[in-house]
């Protein structure tokens, strides 16, 4: 298979790599159908991401189609299922993990940052990180699940609810996702940015 590998700032090469294989009972192998390019990917591309080491396959937003599963994972996933991925790799045993705060796991790593990511043709990971998408979800929608999940968490932690005033600083992808969810929850949203184009997009 092919993978786009960041070998140095501003340098990406397409390499041939071995096909991932099902090894564990909870493994899920899927074909990458579409990926997003996040601001952190661009930062890494420019050499400004301090935790990205080269060489690295970037990408942590994707939608894929299941190709093969381990014998335990087949209870939840079947070949042909449309899926997306929760890209955090957690320990499951630290204090935050034990209390449902896996986003701040003491030992967390990220696909596409600390581990190779989705700018490749096939990917394998544990079923814990896989989310099956319902029928009717487009590839574009599936790819945006990860940033919308970030926005949903932000809106919930901010207490966005009917009649509450919420200020969002920054109208990029995450800011816009947060704004849409806050509005859907009934909040009054003020979003700020220094770029007129982003504000226009948020207004639309």
Regions found by a protein language model. Give the residues of each.
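Cysteine-cluster motifs in flexible loop/terminal segments that predominantly coordinate metals
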Residues: 38, 87-131, 135
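Residue-level marker of beta-strand positions
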Residues: 61, 81-82, 96, 122, ...
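Cytochrome P450 core scaffold surrounding the K-helix E-X-X-R motif
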Residues: 40-46
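Nucleotide donor/acceptor-binding cores
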Residues: 1, 26, 163-164
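Residue-level recognition of beta-strand termini and adjacent short loop/turns
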Residues: 8-10, 24
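Glycine-rich beta-strand-centered segment in the early N-terminal region that forms part
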Residues: 20-35, 48-95, 134-136
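Mid-domain Rossmann-like dinucleotide-binding core that forms the NAD(H)/NADP(H) cofactor-binding site
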Residues: 137-204
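Short Gly/Pro-enriched turn/cap motifs at secondary-structure boundaries
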Residues: 7, 19-20, 53-59, 111-115, ...
């Amino acid at each position: 298979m092919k993978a786009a590998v960041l070998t140095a700032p501003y340098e990406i090469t397409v390499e041939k790599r071995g096909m991932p294989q099902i090894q564990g009972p909870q493994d899920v192998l899927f074909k990458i159908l579409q990926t997003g390019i996040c601001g952190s990917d661009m930062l890494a591309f420019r050499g400004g991401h301090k935790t990205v080491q080269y060489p690295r396959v970037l990408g942590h937003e994707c939608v894929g189609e299941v190709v093969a599963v381990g014998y335990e994972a087949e209870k939840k996933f079947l070949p042909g299922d449309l899926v997306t991925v929760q890209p955090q790799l957690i320990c499951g045993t630290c204090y935050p993990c034990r209390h449902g705060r896996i986003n701040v796991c003491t030992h967390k790593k990220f696909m596409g940052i600390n581990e190779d990511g989705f700018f490749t043709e096939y990917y394998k990971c544990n079923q814990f990180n896989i989310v099956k998408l319902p029928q009717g979800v487009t590839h574009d929608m599936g790819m945006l699940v990860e940033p919308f999940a970030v926005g949903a968490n932000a809106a919930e932690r901010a207490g966005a609810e009917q009649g509450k005033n919420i200020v969002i600083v920054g109208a990029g992808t995450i800011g816009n996702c947060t704004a849409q969810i806050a509005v859907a929850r009934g909040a009054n949203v003020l979003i700020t940015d220094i770029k007129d184009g982003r504000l226009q997009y948020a207004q639309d």
